[in-house]
UniProtKB/Swiss-Prot annotation:
It is found in: Cell projection, Filopodium; Cell projection, Podosome. The lineage of its organism: Eukaryota, Metazoa, Chordata, Craniata, Vertebrata. GO terms for molecular function: nitric-oxide synthase binding. Interacts with the PDZ domain of NOS1 or the second PDZ domain of DLG4 through its C-terminus. Interacts with RASD1 and SYN1, SYN2 and SYN3 via its PID domain. Forms a ternary complex with NOS1 and SYN1. Forms a ternary complex with NOS1 and RASD1. SMART domains: PTB. This is Carboxyl-terminal PDZ ligand of neuronal nitric oxide synthase protein.
């Protein structure tokens, strides 16, 4: 690589538009030094990702097997890529056998792909196809420098271009040679007075003969190219011999068309013809048979497509039927659950009605209790106490000492409850001081018991929410003493919640 100077800051070696080597150098071969990592058979790659993956897999497998890299010399030419093992020469050994040192050799047209690893630019590889087995083989190499690997890859790519140009030149030269030969044959044929065919007729006849040979399709495996070249060689020989052979072929059968006579001219033996195609079979019939065969193949393919679509529709119908059955099973399960819930609800309604009938039978007023009343009602009617009612044990009144001495509240008494829904209010009318002895003789005190009234909906009229109730209940137990003075034991609460009792 030329060194960069002050006026040469651009490296043309990395420019893909500029060729690396002269095209004449590929005739002799361009040599590179590298290290051979290894080779493995790979399936036909479809993308660069698969190629890079195969390259890395080969590297890791050979590294795991502890196989050392070999120093090789890579020769790139128009003949192909040749890999030769590089060894030091011994002093006594003047020459060596190149076949023993040859590692591999692949022609250019069999090389499938050449590239380097994007992660490690020193690693490059090419994939070649084996001519005998058509197996793709990946060969991995490693160079000393990244630039060297890039030059090798670009050199192999340039060898493709050079071979393509050479093939185009060869085809053009062959075409020119054929045109020159035809012009010479035309000039020779025009000088022969006994010749009946002109040059244009010969060209059309040759075209018809070649078409007829292709239409015959001789069933000889592997000899299609040889048969075609042999026919062309016979045609050239006929043109060189002159018109005597053609006249001798055409004159015994003056009424026979040219197309039926041409296979006899080109094909040496009649045994190579198919048994179904005779000399009198017209060419159009054969083409019609080919057309019918192609139409039949097309119909078969369409039938296969239709069958595949039918199978797909059947699968879709089966999936939809399974989904529908599953949905029906779920709906049936939901219906059963709904039925059980309805039965349970009807049972609850019957129980509620029985409770209402029992309560209405005990009620003297005949009022109908609501569901909320039945829910909150217990066996012993609870008592609701206000926060302002003083507690009985904290009262210090000498007037009530004798009256309360013989009064004891049982455990189930409404007066022994704190969390209750009955409101007791006591009020007393204190007589003058001169009448206090009369009260001590056993006159009853005046008190009041007020029950909370319920609406038909079951909601209390005085306390609208449960939160207020709970707050007031807490305040009853923590605030002032209750105002309950005395309730006689012989008096009982009413049966109905709508009644007010005054004692």
């Amino acid at each position: 690589m030329p060194s960069k100077t002050k006026y040469n800051l651009v490296d043309d070696g990395h420019d893909l538009r500029i060729p690396l080597h002269n095209e004449d150098a590929f005739q002799h071969g361009i040599s590179f030094e590298a290290k051979y990592v290894g080779s493995l058979d790979v399936p036909r790659p479809n993308s660069r990702v698969e190629i890079v993956a195969a390259m890395r897999r080969i590297r890791y497998e050979f590294k795991a097997k502890n196989i050392k890299k070999k120093k090789v010399s890579i020769m790139v030419s128009v003949d192909g890529v040749k890999v030769i093992l590089k060894k030091k020469k011994k002093k006594k050994e003047w020459t060596w056998d190149e076949s023993k040192m040859l590692v591999m050799q692949d022609p250019i047209y069999r090389i499938f792909y050449v590239s380097h690893d994007s992660q490690d630019l020193k690693i490059f590889s090419y994939i070649a196809r084996d001519g005998a087995s058509n197996i793709f083989r990946c060969n991995v190499f490693k160079s000393k420098k990244k630039s060297q690997a890039m030059r090798i890859v670009r050199t192999v790519g340039q060898a493709f271009e050079v071979c393509h140009k050479l093939s185009l030149q060869h085809t053009q030269q062959n075409a020119d040679g054929q045109e020159d030969g035809e012009s010479e044959r035309n000039s020779d044929g025009s000088g022969d007075p006994g010749r009946q065919l002109t040059g244009a007729e010969r060209v059309s006849t040759a075209a018809a003969e070649e078409t007829d040979i292709d239409a015959v399709e001789v069933p000889l495996p592997g000899n299609d190219i040889l048969e075609f070249s042999r026919g062309v060689t016979d045609l050239d020989a006929v043109g060189k011999d002159g018109g005597s052979h053609i006249d001798s072929t055409v004159s015994p059968h003056p009424q026979e068309p040219m197309l039926t006579a041409s296979p006899r001219m080109l094909l040496p033996s009649s045994s190579s013809k198919p048994p179904g195609l005779g000399t009198g079979t017209p060419l159009s019939t054969h083409h019609q048979m080919q057309l019918l065969q192609q139409l039949l193949q097309q119909q078969q393919q369409q039938t296969q497509v239709a069958v595949a679509q039918v199978h797909l529709l059947k699968d879709q119908l089966a999936a939809e039927a399974a989904a529908r059955l599953e949905a029906q099973a779920r709906v049936h399960q939901l219906l059963l659950q709904n039925k059980d819930m309805l039965q349970h609800i009807s049972l609850l309604v019957k129980q509620v009605q029985e409770l209402e009938l029992k309560l209405s039978g005990q009620n003297t007023m005949g009022s109908q209790d609501s569901l909320l009343e039945i829910t909150f009602r217990s066996g012993a009617l609870p008592v609701l106490c206000e926060s302002t009612t003083p507690k009985p044990e904290d009262l210090h009144s000498p007037l009530l000492g004798a009256g309360l001495a013989d009064f004891a509240h049982p455990a189930g008494s409404p007066l022994g409850r704190h969390d209750c829904l009955v409101k007791l209010e006591c009020f007393r009318f204190l007589p003058p001081e001169d009448t206090q002895p009369m009260m001590a003789q056993g006159e009853p005190l005046l008190g009041g018991l007020e029950l909370i009234k319920f609406r038909e909906s079951g909601i209390a009229s005085e306390y609208e929410s449960n939160t207020d109730e709970s707050e007031e209940r807490d305040s009853w137990s923590q605030e002032e003493l209750p105002r309950l003075l005395n309730v006689l034991q012989r008096q009982e609460l009413g049966d109905s919640l709508d009644d007010e009792i005054a004692v």
